[in-house]
Amino acid sequence: RDRYIGGESGSVIKNKDNISVRFAFCFPDTYDIGMSHLGMKILYSLINQRADYWCERVFAPGIDFEKLMRENRIPLYALESLDPLSEFDFIGFTMQYELSYTNVLNMLDLAGIPILSKDRDDKLTNIIVAGGPCVCNPEPLADFIDLFILGEGEEVNLELMDLYKKMKSKDFGKKDFLRRAAEIDGIYVPSLYKVYYNDDGTVKEIIPQDNVRPIIKKRIITVSYTHLRAHETTLHL
């Protein structure tokens, strides 16, 4: 039951009318595997401590349930609200192992969201994010992901959501948001860099575009959990 309709003890339910930013935390594997991941629980808790932010969980369906979803045209949805992924501001994937890469693409397709980032429109919604250990090499997924979080996500997730909240209220587009997001430490936006490859497929050179930073340092948490609980960034647009 929990695998597909939620309702577990400890899940966070909020009133959508009071929410400024919605984050779909996607684990690109089945519920049973994803719910054993401690990192998801930590980030889920941190985001949901903010009254106007709502983090919900999304998992890859089993083969049998995916077949039923496609046959009945049911889009991929979050467990807490049962709302389709296409209604979320952020769609964030945690990349724990390379074998889950194809699940990311399948989940986007099941949600009715264009797989390639270049095929999505410039509306400030459905920001596709990826983080976790595998994004130390983001290039295999660079054509599909809007931005990568390099390093630890406890602080940077909230910084991104704070920026999004400010820019959404001023009617900015997705390209504007990604350009500003690239100024945050630990954020890599593939569309703002040109990557050249050697004949053997290895990276030859990465050239930043539009005067973005040439070197991105991964985020490392150096503050206490108490500070993170109270975290809120101040932004000036």
Which residues make up each language-model segment?
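Residue-level signal for short, function-critical loop segments
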Residues: F27-Y31, Y97
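Low-complexity, highly charged intrinsically disordered N-terminal segments
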Residues: M35, G39-I42
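Short helix-loop-beta junction
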Residues: I42-Y53
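Glycine-rich beta-alpha loop elements in corrinoid/cobalamin-binding modules
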Residues: A60-D210
